[in-house]
Structures are given as structure tokens and as C-alpha cells.
Amino acid sequence: MLVTAYLFLLGLLALWGVLEFSACHSKPSASSNALGNPAFRQFQYDFYRTYFPALAADWLQGPYLYKLYQHYHFLEGQIAIIYVCGFGASVFAGLVSVPLTSRLGRRKSCILFCLLLSASYLCKLSQEYFVLMTGRVLGGFSSSLLFSCFEAWYTHEHAEQHDFPAEWLPHTFTRAAAWNGGIAIAAGITANVCAEWLGLGPASPSVLAVPLLVLSVVLVIREWDENYGQTSSFRRVCGDGLRCLLRDRRVLLLGTIQALFESVVYIFIFLWTPVLDPHNAPLGIAFSSFMAASAVGSSLYHLATSKKYHLQPMHVLCLSILMVFFSLFMLTFSTAPGQEHPTESLLAFLLIELACGLYFPAMRFLRRRLIPEKEQTGVLNWFRVPLNLLAGLGLLVLHDSDYQSGTRNMFSLCAVTMLLALLCVVSLFTMVRNDSELRLPASEPEPNGTE
């Protein structure tokens, strides 16, 4: 299992490199004006050197979070409750994060994110169940702030302070998304070195992340100016979002697809460690392999929707759901009690991550076309509620004391969930198949971005 994980990682990194090299040399740069502007390059660099340490700190916790709770001798059900608390915090944070950052200020919100995540990581040094639960709640809340506050600050400064053209924005976020994939891969390898090679234990990656957050805070305080968003009442934002959901069946179907798909992904995040860890898999390397597979999926999406192949995002969305269903079907057999096949399970997990790399840009495109910009915040808030509830209920109801049979049952239910998502996609496709608004024109490249 050890050698297999390393081979998968090396193969995926090589494939990602080939795809990115091909993409860079097969299309002319649309950002030549931006790249030729030294003021823009400096502004972009100043943003990246503050944003990337925060991203790295967020990723470092991923590989050994479940292992840490297991290391403290908590039962599977107790660990599930800790995760559910994190999901609950994410629901609440998703509802209040945008109004909060607008009222408090984006710069202060970035500092708040770093402080909350640092506190969350320091809580992991305790073996007290309540302290660990509190840390997970803080982590769930802070993660919802990460993308909203940093990217909102940059977008405002880009347009209002520096008066750069709006078409230069995708260039910054495309590069950020590419770097984010590389940072996640590096974070997994670094966590593996700390926890396993150096023998520092599963809490060490979280401790290592704190100095990165301190660096990010120092740079924000020293170099960033404050900016604010338009303040709207929480009731109005959610009310407008609910009305949009109810009046447009396409939006309702899209939200259902997102809730079903992403709740399965959340359950996968919980389950991959107890499936692979008993077979001595290097968890950090496995995590880096997942991130590499997701990066490959994102590159394949942009290749598939390019002028050469011209697949539509709706087709890619359907393909990603089919891939996840097939992977979950594999997992119901590879995790059968007494007949475990860890290599097949790892392969299935990699297919799920590959599908995620296809899914997120396709979903982002469809959301942008279907949901009016002024109502997106409210609609996305409503999307997040069933997403987190489904994931939380799945963990609480199905994960019984015998984790092996419980895990297999969870994968079976997740496969059924993906079938429901597939039915929703077919229904949505039938409804919009002649809608040119939801088709990607041959001349329009789909910009990448963080999700």
C-alpha cells in the first residue's frame, strides 16, 4: 500500500504537468496586457504572498484530522459528532459570512479568519473532547471566511483602488486556482513528513500551520487597506435567494444537484482515513494524490470545453456524477468486511477527486448563468443548508459501532444519493437542452477560479 500510494502520486503529478504544459502552449495568452503592466503584477504578487500562506495553513490540517481524533482514542461515533459540529458551524457561517465581511470590513475579516483558524489548530493539542469539538466548530466557521473575505478584498481593490480592467480579474483567480492545487499537494507531503517521517504525530501539521497564519496576519495588517461591501439585511439576502429558488425550477434543480453531490463529498472526507489507515497507507501522500487527481480533473475540464473538443458544462457535470456513482459502487465491494481491497479503494477515492475536478468548474459555470448576480449570495446560502444537513445526518445515522459494516452501508447510501443527483441532472438537461444561455460558445474560454 505504501509503494502504491507513492506511485499514484507520481503518476498523477506527471499527468497534471503534461496537461498544464499542453494548455499553456496550445492557446494564446488572453492576459498579455495584464502581464505587461508592472503595477498589476506587483498588486497581484502582494495579494498572493498574503493569500497563499493562509491557503497552505488551511490545507495542512486535511490529511491527519481524523487520525488525530483516532490517536486520542475516541470512538468512530464520537469522531462523527465532532465532524457534524463542523458541518453545523459551516451552515451558520455560510449564512452570515458575506454580511459579516461587508459590515466588519474585508481586511478585518481576513484577520479574523487567521485568528479563528489558529485557535482551532491550538485546540487540537488538547485531548479533551469538548475542546476538540470547539476547535472543529471554529475551523468550520473560519473555512467559510477564507475564500469570501480574501477574494472579496482583492476584487474591490482591483476595481476601486487601482482601476484595473475587469477582464484582468480572471487572470488572477486562474493563477490562484492553479497555485491552490499545488499548495494542497505540497501541504499533504509536508504533513506526511512531519507526522510520519519525523514521527512528530498527527497534531504536528496543525502546529506547523500556525506560523503561516501569523505571517498572513502580519502582511494583512502591514500592507492592506480596509474596504467594505454593500450592506444588506440578512433577512433580505435570504428572502431574495428563496424567491429565486421557488420561481425558477432550473435553479431549484441545480441546488438539489449541488446538495446531493457535495454532501457525498463531505462524507467521503470523513471516510477515507478509516478505510485506508488500517492498511498502513501514508495519509499525507494519499491526500496529495487526491489533490493531484482533482487538479487533473480541472485541467481535463478546460481541455474538454475548449474549441478542440467543445463539450458543454452540462455534459461534463453528468459525467462527473456518473464517475462518482461508479466509484461508490466499487467501494461497496472493496470495503466489504473481511474482504477489503485497499488498492481498489484508493483508486475509487482518486476517481471521486478526479470527478470533483470536473464538477466544480461545470457547476460554477451553470450557477453563473442561471442565478442573477445580485441573488447569488442568498441562493448559495440556501444550497448550503441541505448540503451540510445531509452530510451530518448521514454520519450520525449510518455510522454504527462496527465501522466496517457501517462504512460499507454509507457508501451504498451515497451511491443511491448519486443516482438521485443523476436523475436531477437528466431532468435539468431535458429542461434546458435548447437554452443557448447555458451553452459555452466556441469563442468563450471558461475561466478557472477557486471554489
From Swiss-Prot:
Organism: Xenopus laevis (African clawed frog)
UniProt keyword list: Cell membrane, Ion transport, Membrane, Transmembrane, Transmembrane helix, Transport
Protein name per the record: Molybdate-anion transporter
Any single Gene Ontology cellular-component annotation: plasma membrane
GO MF annotations in UniProt: molybdate ion transmembrane transporter activity
Record membrane topology: Multi-pass membrane protein
Superkingdom field: Eukaryota
CDD domains: MFS_MFSD5_like
Pfam families: MFS_5
